[in-house]
Amino acid sequence: MAIAVYPGTFDPMTRGHEDLVRRASNIFDELVVGVAHSPNKRPFFSLEERISIAREVLGHYPNVRVEGFAGLLKDFVRKNNARVIVRGLRAVSDFEYEFQMAGMNRYLLPDVETMFLTPSDQYQFISGTFVREIAVLGGDVSKFVFPSVERWLAEKISKPE
């Protein structure tokens, strides 16, 4: 059984993320979407919220499971018996960071491969950061996220902590 892990902060889950999940779920028997704790990134949504959002967006994929994780990706990959780490590459600017991470992951997990997927054309420019900024400033994010994510954003923005 081919198992892959698609890790990320998913703050929030965008249509670009879902596009990669859809395509990766057609390649692997099981895809585990790993929602990272990522305290250094100071996420807009809590880990629990990001897991809930991802499960709402991805719940219709029978071979996709969403789990949160803290700590090293290598431990999460091992825990899930995955043989592949799936990563998205939007632009050349993503490549250097992702290339370095893939090298480190290969060092830590010599028997696990990193597979890069490029987004479909309409999602190449979408990032969680852009979506959050547009939403906070009152802009329309409906083309970038699913309606359930729009609701999560609106609720979070209307109730600042």
From Swiss-Prot:
Catalysed transformations (reactions): (R)-4'-phosphopantetheine + ATP + H(+) = 3'-dephospho-CoA + diphosphate
Keywords: ATP-binding, Coenzyme A biosynthesis, Cytoplasm, Magnesium, Nucleotide-binding, Nucleotidyltransferase, Transferase
EC number, as in UniProt: 2.7.7.3
Cofactors (names): Mg(2+)
Entry GO MF terms: ATP binding; pantetheine-phosphate adenylyltransferase activity
BP terms from Gene Ontology: coenzyme A biosynthetic process
Domain of life where this protein originates: Bacteria
Pathway recorded for this protein: Cofactor biosynthesis; coenzyme A biosynthesis; CoA from (R)-pantothenate: step 4/5
Binding site for substrate: 9, 41, 73, 87
Compartment annotation: Cytoplasm
Keyword Magnesium: yes
Record site: Transition state stabilizer: 17
GO CC annotations on file: cytoplasm
Pfam families: CTP_transf_like (PF01467)
Binding site for ATP: 9-10, 17, 88-90, 98, 123-129
Matching PANTHER family: PHOSPHOPANTETHEINE ADENYLYLTRANSFERASE
UniProt similarity note: Belongs to the bacterial CoaD family.
HAMAP family linked: PPAT_bact
Oligomeric form and interacting partners: Homohexamer.
The protein's name: Phosphopantetheine adenylyltransferase
Organism listed in the record: Cupriavidus pinatubonensis (strain JMP 134 / LMG 1197)
